């Protein structure tokens, strides 16, 4: 069993996202450690890109701050190698096709596997085009994780059958960000995934408080939270780790109790 699937074995998974290098890689490293200490079952690491089309203003801002601070893909790989000495939970990268292309698909997959990454999410690569990337990652034992947005029943079933690691169910159309109300019938979406496959299904996009997290955990195998964490980092900068720790603990408790 892959390390990613194992993350869903002990009840509902809590999956936080962080943009690498905002405000700097040293702080990112500390934040990842405190997130794991406070219950994160799997961690998503964002590799910054200058035009992150799936992201709302919060994560876009983090991308630009990180790039301005001189973060590179190689520096992120080095940080992950350091983290892996202490962190055993699965970690996946979330980035854009261009970042992987410009590094070289095979080289990126090889280096990511070497430093101990478990998978990759490319939100701007449609399902039909994922085979351009998947073989290189498969060869390295990594999962290329598919996103499913509200779409036709047939398409949801098709993606679920082919999916690796876990399925990232997008709770609302549009970009990432905190929502007051989540309107998509995401429960129905997860049900369709489950009818097509036994792969774990996690819900993300727009979840920002324990009540929403508990509600989404009831409907799925896990909950993904990004913007709310990135906003704390934006607010507190190098002092963010303790604030993120507290937030992650409250979210994991809510997910656990659902």
Where are these regions (language model features)?
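Alpha/beta catalytic cores of nucleotide-metabolism and tRNA/nucleoside-modifying enzymes
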Residues: 76, 191-202, 208-258
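Active-site beta->alpha loop and helix N-cap motifs at the rims of alpha/beta catalytic domains
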Residues: 47, 60-123, 255
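Glycine-rich phosphate-binding active-site loops on the catalytic face of alpha/beta enzymes
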Residues: 40-51, 117-121, 126-129, 171-177, ...
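Glycine/Thr-rich beta-alpha phosphate-binding loop at enzyme active sites
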Residues: 61, 69, 156-195, 232-234
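Catalytic cores of alpha/beta
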Residues: 25-35, 151-161, 203, 207-223
